[in-house]
């Protein structure tokens, strides 16, 4: 795939954290989630800026599941919470850390999301579910003249999909590197891919398909 000039390109590593891998089996493990670092690093070579998002939660979060309120059970009365989840990506734990092979110092901009106890966003562009409270990443990309964003991360069918759609709605061209993503379930991955394709997202199988201008 022919790319625009490098100065117009950013590479986005979405929630590539241990919490979404078998490294943390009691959190939200995604099969092979710890095997995408090489592809994320490869796609970053085609970009002038490298950005990342990370879930950054606390043990006081109102969406935490327990024996009375199991995972995926609905939450009422909180506009920025939809369902319950097991504890994951708690700040200061192994789950919060990047997956092996990613260097925190390699990034130009990072988003920490879900810090507030009453918010559990999926996309990395907004802190709320209504896409109103900006994380600043859209503005950062615009200020730096970025027009195209190459994306990968975890998980395809949740945070990756939502972030990609937010970027498209903000007017960016988006390329999703399939080899730099892993998802939770075949049916939800397929649905996410269809939704992203309908929004105009372009797909590559891996970073070797990218071609510099």
List the model feature ranges, each with a label:
Residues 104-144:
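Histidine/lysine/aspartate-rich catalytic loop segments that bind and position anionic ligands
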Residues 120, 158-162, 183-186, 212:
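Short active-site-adjacent structural elements
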Residues 1-115, 143, 147, 169-176, ...:
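Active-site acidic carboxylates
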Residues 63-64, 126-130, 157-158:
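Short acidic/polar alpha-helix capping motifs at helix-coil junctions
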Residues 146-162, 176-181:
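Glycine-rich anion-binding loop/nest that anchors nucleotide
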Residues 164, 168:
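Gly/Ala-rich phosphate-binding loop of Rossmann-like dinucleotide-binding domains
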């Amino acid at each position: 795939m022919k790319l625009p000039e490098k100065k117009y390109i950013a590479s986005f590593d979405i929630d590539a954290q241990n919490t979404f891998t078998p490294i943390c089996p009691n959190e939200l493990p995604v099969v092979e989630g710890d095997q995408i670092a090489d592809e994320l690093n490869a796609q970053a070579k085609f970009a002038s800026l490298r950005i990342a998002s990370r879930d950054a939660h606390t043990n006081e979060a109102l969406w935490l599941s327990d024996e009375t309120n199991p995972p995926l059970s609905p939450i009422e009365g909180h506009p920025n919470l939809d369902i319950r989840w097991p504890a994951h990506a708690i700040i200061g734990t192994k789950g919060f850390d990047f997956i092996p092979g990613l260097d925190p110092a390699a990034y130009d901009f990072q988003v920490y999301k879900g810090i507030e106890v009453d918010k559990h966003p999926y996309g990395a562009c907004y802190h709320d579910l209504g896409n109103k409270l900006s994380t600043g990443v859209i503005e950062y990309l615009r200020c730096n003249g970025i027009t195209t964003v190459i994306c990968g991360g975890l998980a395809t069918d949740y945070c990756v999909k939502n972030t990609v759609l937010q970027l498209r709605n903000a007017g960016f061209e988006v390329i999703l590197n399939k080899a730099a993503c892993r998802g939770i379930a075949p049916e939800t991955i397929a649905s996410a891919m269809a939704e992203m394709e309908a929004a105009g997202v372009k797909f590559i199988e891996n970073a070797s398909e990218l071609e510099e201008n």
